[in-house]
Amino acid sequence: MNKRKILIIVAILFILIGTILLCFPSASNYIYEKNVETEKEKFVVKITDEQNENILDKLYKKLQEENQKIYEEKQNKLVDPFSYEQSAIDLSEYGIENNVIGYISIPKINIEVPILLGANTANMKKGAVHLTETSYPIGGVNTNSVIAAHRVYGKATLFRYIDKIGVGDKIRIRNFKEELTYEVYETKIINPDDISELEIEEGQDIITLITCHPYRINTQRYIVKAKRVWNTTLCLF
C-alpha cells in the first residue's frame, strides 16, 4: 500500500472518529431522555392507581406539615445551597421508588427531568434535586421550593441552558398529587454562600431553580425564581 493510500485511510478514520465524538453527546442525551420517559410512565402508573390514593394522601399531608414547620422555624438550618444531602422523608415508605417526588418541565429549554429528594451526589447524577430545609415541591402559601441541578452531567443535559429562561416563561412541576405551574419573574447571579434567595417570601408560593455558573467555571450560582399561576391548561402528562 503506497503512502498516499495510507494518508487517505488515516484521514477517513479521523473524520469518522470526529463524527462519532460530535454525535455522542446528542445520542447520550437522547438515551437519557428515553430513560426519563420510561421511568415517568412507571411513576404515573403508581400515582394514578386508586389503591395508592390513601397512602399518597398521607404523604401529601406529611409534606404540608413539613413545609409549615420549615416556615415556622424560619429555615434556621439553611447554610449553603448545595449542602442538603439527606432528605427528611423516605418516599419508599409511601410506595414511591427511586426517591423521585415528581418531574419538572421547562418548555423554553425543552427539558423534563425527575426531581429527587436530597441534593447528594448520587441523586444529582439522575436529574434535578430538592434541597432539604427548603419547602417541598407541593405548592402552598409561604413556600419556596428550591430545586438544583448540574448544567450537564455525563450523558444528561440538565440545567445547561438555564440562562435562556426569561421573565414570563413557564415552569411546570408534576408531583405525586397534582401539576403546578409557575411563571418566571426574576433571574439572577449570586455567590455560592448567598442563601437569601432561598428563603421563603411571606405569603408567596414560589420555586427557585439553582445551578453552577458560568458553565464549566462554576464560581457563582445562577438562579431562576418563579411564582405560582393557575391560568393554564397544558398538562405535563
Segments (PLM) and residue ranges:
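Positively charged n-region of N-terminal signal peptides that target proteins for export
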Residues: M1-K5
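Solvent-exposed, non-transmembrane regions of membrane-associated and secreted proteins
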Residues: I8-F237
